[in-house]
Every structure is written in C-alpha cells, then in structure tokens.
Amino acid sequence: MQQLKKIDLDEIWQKEQGWNAKRKSGRKFDDEVELRFWEELAPHYAERFNLYRDVYGLGDWIHEKFGENQRILDVGSGCGNFTIPMAKYSQDILAVDFSPAMLRELSISLQREGLTNVKAVHSKWEDFEEPYDADYVLSVNSLYRVCYMREALEKIARYGKKGFILVRTLLKPYLYSLYDELSLNYRRNNDYMMMPMMFSTSL
C-alpha cells in the first residue's frame, strides 16, 4: 500500500486517457461540444441507453447496498435512469449533471412519476461544492471528462459518509469471449485497468 500511495494517479490517468494530446478537441476538452452532444441525445437517451433497465440485477444490487430511506448524491445523474428508481426507496436524492438538456428530461420524468424528493443541480462534478449530507454517492459512467481523477474520487469519498458506488461500462465487443477463443485482438479501454489503483490510492 505504501508503494501505491507514491504513484501519481493523475499523471497515469491523463496519459492513458489522452489528456496530454497536442490537439485538444472534441467532447472531452470542449464544454460546448459536450453540451450540444447531450442536447441532441437527451430526448431519446432513456429509451436507447438505460443500464438500470438493461443490466439484469444491477438496480437490485445497488438497492441492496444502499438500503431504504437513505440520502443519495447521484453524480452525473443525466436524465434519471438510476435517479428515478432510487428515489422510490430513498429519503431524498441530489442529482448533479452538467447537461441542462438531460436535467430537463429528469424533471419531466420526476413529474410523470409524481416524485418530489429529488433536487437537481446543474454543475460539473469538478465544480460542485453544494453542501449535502449524503449517506451514499452513486456515479454511473460520469467521470469520463475528469482530468484530475484523484481529486474527483476524493470528493466522492468525502460526500459519501457511508460509502459510494462507481458503475463503469466495460468497453468490450459483443461476444468478446469468442474473440478470446479465436485469439483475435480487440480494443479495451484502459481506464478500467486503472480503477483498482484509484480506489487504493485515493480512499
């Protein structure tokens, strides 16, 4: 553990994720590009991309870990794929997201479901400083634009007094086991290789 603490987590993360690229363009680096991307996708996102719905058992597992009547901070809540079902068993939820378009969709869903225990905040996680006495923090695929990962994870740990869950979608091709059997190469996203190190060094 002592050796792990000496590792410069941010340096490794930034290298693996291309933050040191000479040409900095696209969603990762440009807020306006990112906002336009979500403005277009937001109305259809919940229907097309919903991990809570599509990954069997994930929602139940999170429910089991968080328990009933807890205060949840949802980092990168988006349109509420996880926020909405969690609100039905939580005391209250603070939903933080950088996209106004996605937060509008969240508001529509909350009204449709008759839920009043969710407050939405428009903010990047890096800039978020609002006081909130959370029991747990949930982050689902929401840290991909973070440059300083150590600071982002330490903030999550500070807010989640009882703990936190990070959900990350693995970048593997469909039927990847078949690729392995045939000794075919396929691309992996290196940030998932770094996640265990992040937990060890930051928490």
Please give the residue ranges for each predicted region.
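Short conserved loop adjoining the S-adenosyl-L-methionine
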Residues: 127-132
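Class I SAM-dependent methyltransferase SAM/SAH-binding core
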Residues: 79-126
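A short SAM/SAH-binding and catalytic strip from SAM-dependent methyltransferases
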Residues: 136-148
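A short glycine-rich, Lys/Arg-flanked "PGG" loop and its adjoining helix->strand segment in the class I
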Residues: 150-164
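Short alpha-helix
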Residues: 192-203
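Conserved class I S-adenosyl-L-methionine
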Residues: 2-66, 69-78, 165-191
